[in-house]
């Protein structure tokens, strides 16, 4: 493990630099500016020797008169290259962050559906926002400080060697001890930084859930619970941050102590070996000045280590995400529009954990007909609907579309044939028109309005002040449940796909909303192959075929009347729902 850490760090650096490579001209300019900045600082230290020797020991009036001009030019040039270097390095950093965020977001969008089942939105947002931002500190802030300070250290050591190499060598004896201290804190900070990455994901997740579910939080009195949970997460984050701070403090204090010992050794050597080592007063003071100047860059370099380790931990988190395999798309067949005949042949499906949730499922949906899946929660209905657009990949068996296995169709072509209307409608914080036209961005306003009318959405949209240009808020929060459903149906109508998946599209709606939704669904189902998932059996009476699922297996199939005649599982479900409906009417 100890031997792998430097190798792992080098690999991370190498991979990170591949994202910096496109911006190398600006990076090179920034590096040169920072080198020049450090060179000017080291030059000023050497000027101390010349100033003292030529002003007080061997007086050189010509040189003394030039000192103000030299200082003015040096400071002006130092300011220019400092600003140039800072601008260039920041430009590179923000460019890298922009590119990385775009790549990470694009990668997340194309990950398999089962990854979303396991990951939380808070963790994903933390990677896009926090982890990528840590990379910026490595690619700009840390790199700038590293170049400036390492060049200054080299420059000052060079000045010391030029002035008196004997004393300088004594100071260099302290360098291995600095390396030992830095190596110790390096490992500790990296380990803690991984915990910081994780806790930031947890903090984001808790906050995101509480904000999105604020109605549930308030109605069930969960405010104090959420605040306590958030406080615990932030306290854990604070403790990890403090561990990093302690490591940095040990690092800085240890390095400063080593440098102080080095300075003391040189002063003692200069005093006791004055007969052997002969230097001028200016040279001696210049060496002392150089050593004192070394404290700041050495301190910065040691604290910089913690920043670099945090950045590398962030980079590692980002790269681990980017290394996850994308949704597999080996299909090569492209179809403009299918008839819509679907067949499930001996279909099995198991989750990654090995739990089989579908067992030998076989059925056919004729083109242009409707099939409803019913059964208790967890019976496999939604899994079947998820297999059709290949959100999940089959464990065994074949699903065909117009006789072609869906694995042979390209994902884009396959999903182009389908529309989805689900219980949990997804609307974007945009206008109603853009939400209806989602995926059909080239649609005209007339086409959007026509879809709205067919979905019985135009009547409430036309009453809004901005009509179809009304923004709906985050996830359509400004609309009622029934209104959101009608927008989703309008979106499906506009897409005009030959296959329609209705996943609990009318559940949890009031009677008036359900009336509108049913009327809208009749419009969108015309001439389309429709797969319906429903709990309310009253909504699927007219389906051409009803399939009853239980524990991942098909137990019955037939029309509504046929299944009632069998007096099996479906009939039992229907009687229970009818009895509940009668009770509701009596109570009302």
Regions found by a protein language model. Name each.
Residues 74-93, 140, 144-151, 172-196, ...:
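Alpha-helical transmembrane segments of multi-pass membrane proteins
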Residues 22, 26-36, 69-74, 144-194, ...:
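Transmembrane helices of ABC transporter permease
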Residues 330, 337-588:
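ABC-type nucleotide-binding domain
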Residues 2-6, 58, 94, 102-126, ...:
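Short intracellular "coupling" helices and adjacent cytoplasmic loop segments at the cytosolic face
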Residues 32, 40-44, 81, 129-173, ...:
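Hydrophobic alpha-helical transmembrane segments of ABC transporter permease domains
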Residues 57-63, 159-173, 247-316, 321-322:
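Helix-loop-helix
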Residues 1-40, 56-70, 85-89, 93, ...:
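Membrane-integrated ABC transporters
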Residues 25, 113-114, 130-139, 143, ...:
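An intracellular "coupling" helix at the cytosolic face of ABC transporter transmembrane type-1 domains
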């Amino acid at each position: 493990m100890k031997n792998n850490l430097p190798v792992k760090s080098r690999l991370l650096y190498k991979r990170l630099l591949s994202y910096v490579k496109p911006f190398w001209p600006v990076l090179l300019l920034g590096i040169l500016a920072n080198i020049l900045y450090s060179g000017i600082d080291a030059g000023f230290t050497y000027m101390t020797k010349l100033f003292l020797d030529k002003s007080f020991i061997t007086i050189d009036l010509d040189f003394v008169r030039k000192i103000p001009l030299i200082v003015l030019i040096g400071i002006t040039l130092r300011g220019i290259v400092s600003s140039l270097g800072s601008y260039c390095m920041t430009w590179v950093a923000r460019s890298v962050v922009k590119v990385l965020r775009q790549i990470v977001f694009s990668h997340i969008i194309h990950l398999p559906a089962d990854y979303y089942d396991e990951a939380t939105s808070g963790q994903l947002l933390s990677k896009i926002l926090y982890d990528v931002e840590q990379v910026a500190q490595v690619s700009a802030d840390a790199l700038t400080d590293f170049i400036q300070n390492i060049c200054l250290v080299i420059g000052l050591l060079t000045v010391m060697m030029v002035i008196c190499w004997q004393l300088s060598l004594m100071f260099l004896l302290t360098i291995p001890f600095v390396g030992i201290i830095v190596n110790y804190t390096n490992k500790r900070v990296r380990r803690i930084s991984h915990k910081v990455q994780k806790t930031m994901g947890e903090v984001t997740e808790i906050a995101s859930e509480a904000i999105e579910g604020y109605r549930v939080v308030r109605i069930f009195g969960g405010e104090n619970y959420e605040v306590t949970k958030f406080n615990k997460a932030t306290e854990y984050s604070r403790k990890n941050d403090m561990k990093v701070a302690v490591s940095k403090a040990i690092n800085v204090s240890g390095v400063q102590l080593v440098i102080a010992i080095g300075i003391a050794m040189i002063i003692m050597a200069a005093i006791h070996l004055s007969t052997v080592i002969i230097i001028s007063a200016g040279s001696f003071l210049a060496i002392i000045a150089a050593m004192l100047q070394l404290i700041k860059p050495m301190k910065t370099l040691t604290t910089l280590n913690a920043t670099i380790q945090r950045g590398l931990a962030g980079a590692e988190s980002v790269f681990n995400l980017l290394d996850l395999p994308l949704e597999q798309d080996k299909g090569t067949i492209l179809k403009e529009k299918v008839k819509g005949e679907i067949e499930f042949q001996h279909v099995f499906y198991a989750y990654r954990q090995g739990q089989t949730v579908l067992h030998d499922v076989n059925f056919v949906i004729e083109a242009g007909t409707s099939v409803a899946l019913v059964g208790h929660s967890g019976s496999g209905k939604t899994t079947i609907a998820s297999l059709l657009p290949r959100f999940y990949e089959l464990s065994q068996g074949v699903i065909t579309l117009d006789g072609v296995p869906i694995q042979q169709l390209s994902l884009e072509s396959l999903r182009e044939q389908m529309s989805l209307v689900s219980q949990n409608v997804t609307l974007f914080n945009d206008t109603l028109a853009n939400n209806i036209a989602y995926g059909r961005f080239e649609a005209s306003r007339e086409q959007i309005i026509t879809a709205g009318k067919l979905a019985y959405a135009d009547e409430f949209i036309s009453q809004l002040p901005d009509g179809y240009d009304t923004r709906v808020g985050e996830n359509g929060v400004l609309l009622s449940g029934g209104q959101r459903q009608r927008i989703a149906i309008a979106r499906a109508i506009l897409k005009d796909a030959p296959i329609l998946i209705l996943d609990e599209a009318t559940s949890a709606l009031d009677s008036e909303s359900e009336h509108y939704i049913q009327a809208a669904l009749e419009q969108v189902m015309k001439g389309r192959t429709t797969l319906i998932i429903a709990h309310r059996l009253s909504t699927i009476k007219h389906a051409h075929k009803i399939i009853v699922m239980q524990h991942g297996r098909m137990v019955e199939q037939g029309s509504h009347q046929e299944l009632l005649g069998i007096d099996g599982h479906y009939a039992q479900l229907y009687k229970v729902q009818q009895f509940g409906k009668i009770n509701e009417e009596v109570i009302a």
